[in-house]
């Protein structure tokens, strides 16, 4: 790092103090500032690996899972009700996400289970909530899927060729055809 900085004639930034480090780490990993007790425990720790220990402690905490769950539910636009049912699809979806995060399921597996989901919602097919969220709106689901998992915005290709990228309207609807066969039986209250 030092060699790279010198080659670019850049100055190394000062190392932050333990108070700032703990505050930033808590906010980043679990979404809140440390309590006074937590902060003082970290400050008073004389172990040379105290930063690594704190990182591991926070990554293995329920606070981390809950913070990640908030991020995932925002990203996936989880909603409680799906048109045409009184089943709280959002609660089932959130439980599946929470269980996936607690079990430390790898990111690629979560995505595969969401995009390739099948089965019955209340019989082990909780990931199907990803498609139920946009029930009857395959175009919205596709543009959302592409944006979240591939980092490309395709919404404009619903109506015309993308003005800045290579995507055509025809390609958009070809991709939409992949999920247009996804159907569901009438959801009934259970």
Predicted regions and their residues:
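Short, structured secondary-structure elements
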Residues: 2-190
């Amino acid at each position: 790092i030092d060699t790279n900085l010198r080659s670019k004639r850049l100055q190394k930034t000062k190392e932050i103090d333990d108070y700032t480090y703990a505050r930033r780490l808590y906010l980043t990993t679990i979404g809140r500032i440390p309590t006074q007790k937590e902060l003082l425990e970290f400050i008073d720790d004389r172990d040379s690996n105290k930063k690594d220990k704190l990182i591991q402690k926070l990554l293995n905490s329920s606070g981390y899972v809950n913070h990640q769950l908030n991020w995932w539910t925002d990203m996936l636009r989880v909603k409680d009700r799906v048109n045409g049912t009184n089943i709280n699809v959002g609660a089932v979806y959130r439980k599946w996400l929470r269980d996936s995060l607690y079990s430390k399921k790898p990111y690629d597996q979560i995505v595969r289970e969401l995009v390739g989901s099948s089965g019955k919602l209340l019989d082990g097919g909780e990931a199907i909530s990803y498609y139920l969220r946009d029930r009857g709106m395959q175009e919205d689901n596709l543009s959302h899927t592409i944006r979240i998992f591939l980092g490309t915005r395709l919404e404009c290709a619903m109506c015309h060729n993308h003005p800045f990228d290579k995507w055509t309207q025809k390609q958009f609807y070809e991709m939409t055809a992949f999920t247009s066969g996804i159907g569901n039986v009438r959801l009934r209250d259970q």
